[in-house]
From Swiss-Prot:
GO molecular function: rRNA binding; structural constituent of ribosome
NCBIfam families documented for this protein: rplX_bact
Cited function: One of two assembly initiator proteins, it binds directly to the 5'-end of the 23S rRNA, where it nucleates assembly of the 50S subunit. One of the proteins that surrounds the polypeptide exit tunnel on the outside of the subunit.
PANTHER family listed in its UniProt record: MITOCHONDRIAL RIBOSOMAL PROTEIN L24
The protein's name: Large ribosomal subunit protein uL24
CDD domains referenced in this protein's UniProt entry, alphabetically: KOW_RPL26
Similarity field: Belongs to the universal ribosomal protein uL24 family.
Organism: Buchnera aphidicola subsp. Acyrthosiphon pisum (strain APS) (Acyrthosiphon pisum symbiotic bacterium)
Keyword Ribonucleoprotein listed: yes
Annotated HAMAP family: Ribosomal_uL24_B
Subunit structure: Part of the 50S ribosomal subunit.
Amino acid sequence: MALKLRRNDSVVILTGKDKGKTGIIKNILSLNQVIVKGLNLIKKHQKPVPSQNKSGGIIEKEAPIHISNIAILNPESNKADRIGFRFEEGRKVRFFKSTGKTIQ
């Protein structure tokens, strides 16, 4: 199955502690997970590494989210939407299912 979401797509979180918030896909991981910029933050306890001059402490970083828990954001309606594929001029393009407009 082709992955319908791509890097730098605007998405909305459907479930979890950040439900309803919007963000941009920063990275796509294996196992159908993505990292959304600034959302699903976790606190990681970092040990100090004196040999590399790294100080320890608590850092915040983005955790992966499964693709079933996010949806692409349609900029016209400002709501979550579904994605479809079609061929235009010999190229496979993505489009919004609700409006039929192609995704840039």
